[in-house]
Amino acid sequence: MKLNKYIDHTLLKQDAKKKQIDSLLSEAREYDFASVCVNPTWVEHAKKGLEGTDVKVCTVVGFPLGATTSAVKAFETKEAIQNGADEIDMVINVGALKSGNLALVESDIRAVVEASGDKLVKVIIEACLLTDQEKVVVCQLAQKAGADFVKTSTGFSTGGATIADVTLMRETVGSDMGVKAAGGARSYADALAFVEAGATRIGTSAGVAILKGELADGDY
């Protein structure tokens, strides 16, 4: 198994400096990760830094709260793609889901899917804030709206991916969608366990340590 191609090598900290982003890009080139995941302000820089590789540039939309309007999320998506993004990780409207406004949750996801054209869209459900029933419902809505992946977490809330959540999400969407486990993978064994539970992508800042068989520090 080429575990490197499961990994979105991630740096989303608000105080990330250019030299840290450059280090992320260098590691991505060396280890040939699936993508780097960076904030929108770094997309253009990342695209240039990964020229000549097949490492994708992933960025986030409506991040980390998901509480911006659908129009803003659609604009963010279009701008990110213009700047070179290959993949979009959007955050759902958690408050709308909790309020039972499923039509808004679905239309919000659909707005990003439509704005993305042929680019990959991953839907962050922020599983740590949801009941199991809400997790099932929002995964179904993401599937209905035409998204490519469901993703567990932003890494900025109360918890990251769990094996139980990845298993439930995979059972819900079947084989038609990707499942991304974000946060929680600190070692090779962790990453492998998520893959065995049904994850097809792993979001982590610890990609290098994972591939080296080391235990990483940090919380994402």
Curated annotation (Swiss-Prot):
Q: Does the keyword Cytoplasm apply?
A: yes
A Pfam family per the record: DeoC
> What does the record give as its pathway?
Carbohydrate degradation; 2-deoxy-D-ribose 1-phosphate degradation; D-glyceraldehyde 3-phosphate and acetaldehyde from 2-deoxy-alpha-D-ribose 1-phosphate: step 2/2
* Catalytic function, reaction form: 2-deoxy-D-ribose 5-phosphate = D-glyceraldehyde 3-phosphate + acetaldehyde
Positions annotated as active site in the UniProt record: 89, 151, 180
Record-level GO BP terms: 2-deoxyribose 1-phosphate catabolic process; carbohydrate catabolic process; deoxyribonucleotide catabolic process
* One Gene Ontology term, aspect cellular component: cytoplasm
Q: Which family does it belong to?
A: Belongs to the DeoC/FbaB aldolase family. DeoC type 1 subfamily.
Q: What is this protein called?
A: Deoxyribose-phosphate aldolase
